[in-house]
Amino acid sequence: MAETRIHPSAVVDPAAQVGEGCEIGPFCVIGPEVGLGRGVVLKSHVVVAGETLIGDETVVFPFASLGEVPQDLKFRGERTRLEIGARNRIREYVTMNPGTEGGGGVTRIGDDGLFMAGSHVAHDCQIGNRVILVNNASVAGHCVLEDDVIVGGLSGVHQFVRIGRGAMIGAVTMVTADVIPFGLVQGPRGHLDGLNLVGLKRRGASREEIHALRDMLAQLGQGSFRDTARHLAEAENGPMVREVLDFILGPSDRSFLAPHP
């Protein structure tokens, strides 16, 4: 592992924990409760504040702000934190806030994500692995984005929304309710527009699994998602269908995005 390099113009608090092989570029500011894993790269003009942990080999581009106080009027300075996993790419002007006392106290970002320029992750969000936020996408507080979710550019996700594994949100889309795993959401007032077929095929879903998901989705569209899911759950189902049904029947503070009438 290469030695750690810190530019002379960077301000790194002596109490910060900086791992082996890190690169901290010009005009970065690193607070006393920050922990950087091995090989983390902060390009330049990056601010990392609060109790923020950044995992190994994550690269942060200029003017990102990580761990500054939540944009929540109820926040009163309580001790909370931001945890960012390994091998993430955090592009220019990205903002990520720590948790709040009322939301569990921790914002978590998984591994291998791509957060494009200007995207935002608010307080208390739980973000899975390999998640992509395209330019200027915003995720409000308390949201859950499971693994392999993609949120298109200029899209917004309402607070407390859950987005299931492998779902795709199109560009310029407002997501106000939960999105089932493998769903495709489009339109200014987001609606469920079928399955994320490209994502399913990339992950090796078989033709039979895709047909089963389509059949399930057709039945869900005929009535209440929860009532229909309870009925479908009584039958034998493959793992992908079971995952969707379990998601629908799980705890939630929101309704579900339904197919466009």
Curated annotation (Swiss-Prot):
Protein's GO biological process: lipid A biosynthetic process
EC number in record: 2.3.1.129
InterPro entries on file: Acetyltransf_C, Acetyltransf_C_sf, Hexapep_transf_CS, Lipid_A_LpxA, Trimer_LpxA-like_sf
The keyword Lipid metabolism appears for this protein: yes
CDD domains named in the record: LbH_UDP-GlcNAc_AT
Keywords from the UniProt entry: Acyltransferase, Cytoplasm, Lipid A biosynthesis, Lipid biosynthesis, Lipid metabolism, Repeat, Transferase
Repeat as UniProt keyword: yes
Main location: cytoplasm
Any one of the GO CC terms: cytoplasm
Pathway named in the protein's UniProt entry: Glycolipid biosynthesis; lipid IV(A) biosynthesis; lipid IV(A) from (3R)-3-hydroxytetradecanoyl-[acyl-carrier-protein] and UDP-N-acetyl-alpha-D-glucosamine: step 1/6
Cell location: Cytoplasm
Pfam families: Acetyltransf_11
UniProt GO MF annotations: acyl-[acyl-carrier-protein]-UDP-N-acetylglucosamine O-acyltransferase activity
Catalytic activities: a (3R)-hydroxyacyl-[ACP] + UDP-N-acetyl-alpha-D-glucosamine = a UDP-3-O-[(3R)-3-hydroxyacyl]-N-acetyl-alpha-D-glucosamine + holo-[ACP]
PROSITE patterns membership: HEXAPEP_TRANSFERASES
PANTHER family assigned to the protein according to its UniProt record, in alphabetical order: ACYL-[ACYL-CARRIER-PROTEIN]--UDP-N-ACETYLGLUCOSAMINE O-ACYLTRANSFERASE, ACYL-[ACYL-CARRIER-PROTEIN]--UDP-N-ACETYLGLUCOSAMINE O-ACYLTRANSFERASE, MITOCHONDRIAL-RELATED
Family assignment from sequence similarity: Belongs to the transferase hexapeptide repeat family. LpxA subfamily.
Function per UniProt: Involved in the biosynthesis of lipid A, a phosphorylated glycolipid that anchors the lipopolysaccharide to the outer membrane of the cell.
Assembly mode: Homotrimer.
UniProt protein name: Acyl-[acyl-carrier-protein]--UDP-N-acetylglucosamine O-acyltransferase
UniProt source species: Paracoccus denitrificans (strain Pd 1222)
